[in-house]
């Protein structure tokens, strides 16, 4: 599903997830810690929390269906887990689009060592 998430991000932001979001700030990409540094990093934090809620179904790697309808991403029918993961990805991609005006290139490839302070809680 990471490829599908990348396609959603590309559709919403016109940017490829790699390199623009895969290592952005303290929460985009694998894992996350400390405080979310920018609006785009907050989208990634919420996405991580969303995946955490759906992880009980061990669904993080489930393939899902989605389509574009009238310029909007729409998740298709599938198992409960597939639908949940699709919604997590769809909401995050839309959040990244809304935060485009605050995107900071200085947070691309942000080193984990600079992620300080208390971690956010879901």
From Swiss-Prot:
pH-activity profile: Optimum pH is 8.0.
Keywords from the named record: Calcium, Disulfide bond, Hydrolase, Lipid degradation, Lipid metabolism, Metal-binding, Myotoxin, Neurotoxin, Secreted, Toxin
Residues noted as binding Ca(2+) in the record, renumbered to the chain: 27, 29, 31, 48
Description of activity control: Inhibited by Mn(2+), Mg(2+), Zn(2+) and Cu(2+).
Family per record: Belongs to the phospholipase A2 family. Group II subfamily. D49 sub-subfamily.
Needed co-factor(s): Ca(2+)
Domain of life: Eukaryota
GO biological process, any: phospholipid metabolic process
Protein name per Swiss-Prot or TrEMBL: Basic phospholipase A2 LmTX-I
Disulfide bonds: 26-115, 28-44, 43-95, 49-122, 50-88, 75-86
Active site, renumbered: 47, 89
Single GO MF descriptor: toxin activity
Keyword Hydrolase on entry: yes
CDD domains membership: PLA2c (cd00125)
Cofactor descriptive note: Binds 1 Ca(2+) ion.
Matching InterPro entries: PLipase_A2, PLipase_A2_Asp_AS, PLipase_A2_dom, PLipase_A2_dom_sf, PLipase_A2_His_AS
Top EC group: hydrolase
EC numbers, comma separated: 3.1.1.4
Annotated tissue distribution: Expressed by the venom gland.
Pfam families found in the cross-reference section: Phospholip_A2_1 (PF00068)
Catalytic reaction(s) noted: a 1,2-diacyl-sn-glycero-3-phosphocholine + H2O = a 1-acyl-sn-glycero-3-phosphocholine + a fatty acid + H(+)
GO annotation, cellular component aspect: extracellular region
Temperature notes for this entry: Optimum temperature is 35-45 degrees Celsius.
Assembly and binders: Monomer.
Primary role: Snake venom phospholipase A2 (PLA2) that displays neurotoxic and myotoxic activities. Induces inflammatory edema by mechanisms involving mast cell activation and arachidonic acid metabolites. Increases plasma creatine kinase activity. PLA2 catalyzes the calcium-dependent hydrolysis of the 2-acyl groups in 3-sn-phosphoglycerides.
Subcellular localization, as worded in the UniProt entry: Secreted
């Amino acid at each position: 599903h990471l490829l599908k998430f990348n396609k959603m991000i590309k559709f919403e932001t016109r940017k490829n997830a790699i390199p623009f979001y895969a290592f952005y700030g303290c929460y985009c990409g694998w894992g996350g810690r400390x405080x979310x540094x920018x609006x785009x990093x907050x989208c990634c934090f919420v996405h991580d929390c969303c995946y955490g809620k759906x992880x009980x179904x061990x669904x993080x790697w489930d393939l899902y269906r989605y389509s574009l309808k009238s310029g909007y991403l729409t998740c298709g029918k599938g198992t409960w887990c597939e639908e949940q993961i699709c919604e997590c990805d769809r909401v995050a991609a839309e959040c990244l689009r809304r935060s485009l005006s605050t995107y900071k290139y200085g947070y691309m490839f942000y080193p984990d060592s600079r992620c300080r302070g208390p971690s956010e809680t879901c």
